[in-house]
Amino acid sequence: KFLMVDVKQTPETYGIDADKRPKAQFYIGLSLLLPITIYLFVFYVSASYSAFFKDFESTSLTAAIFAPNALKNAISDGWLEAVFVGTIPFVFMGLGYLLHMFQKTKRTMSYLKLGALFILTFMFDIILAYLIEKKIFDYERVLGEFFSPSIAIQSVNFWGIIFAGFVVYVIWGLVFDFVMNEHENVDKIK
């Protein structure tokens, strides 16, 4: 029993590489990760519902992105819509988890996979932003005007949607990676 206490107090004596930083970093990271996760869930449920199923009644960006009853409306629209809208946030969280896993190995292939994940996520956010911006455009369209990618790219709403999703997704992935790394350091010796 004395040996176990000694190992915990001086792990380097026994050849164990243990970080003695306080557990506070883990708990601070976790306390940041939880609300960011909730935000991502709300954002992607709302944005995906708005992009694929919502009929617009306003040109407000907030109303376009954040549909307060998106999940409830998707459920009432049908089980397929509910499953689609309800599971999209987990796709992004899964991609964030893969970011963490690919960062563990420092190989060229891992960096290529990381780049591919960022591009994939960014492209999906572009699709969501494009579809939402198109619905806003169609709502306020003047007869004879047609929506195009160049109109979307010039729209502040388009970029606002991308950054509200993609930038927060990147932050979530980095915080998640930090929390997972700190969790490994909390107690290497049990």
PLM region spans:
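Long, non-membrane, amphipathic alpha-helices that form coiled-coils
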Residues: 1-27, 179-190
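Hydrophobic alpha-helical transmembrane segments of integral membrane proteins
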Residues: 19-183
